[in-house]
């Protein structure tokens, strides 16, 4: 049983990344199931912290991207909007 309010496709989710931070950081949505969404983000020089590993802020952006998109897919977006904090 799907948790999504409507039937969404992975192609639709991918189209949501245009011209925003997700695109800038290279976040790619790779899989969409009935109750989950999967994305990946490359670790680049500009997303590493001083010790060479992924910066925590970049990790938060990835989590925010997944959470916000999934939240909006669970509601009637004509009546409500879900945003992150």
Regions found by a protein language model. Give the residues of each.
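Terminal targeting signals and extreme-terminal segments of soluble enzymes
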Residues: 1-85
């Amino acid at each position: 049983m799907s948790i999504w309010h409507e039937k969404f496709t992975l192609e639709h989710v991918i189209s949501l990344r245009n011209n925003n931070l997700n695109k800038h950081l290279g976040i790619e949505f790779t899989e969409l199931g009935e109750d989950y969404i999967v994305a990946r983000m490359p670790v680049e020089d500009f997303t590493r912290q001083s010790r060479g590993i992924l910066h925590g802020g970049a990790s938060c952006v990835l989590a925010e991207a997944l959470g916000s998109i999934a939240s909006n897919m669970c509601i009637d977006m004509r009546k409500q909007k879900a945003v992150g904090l």
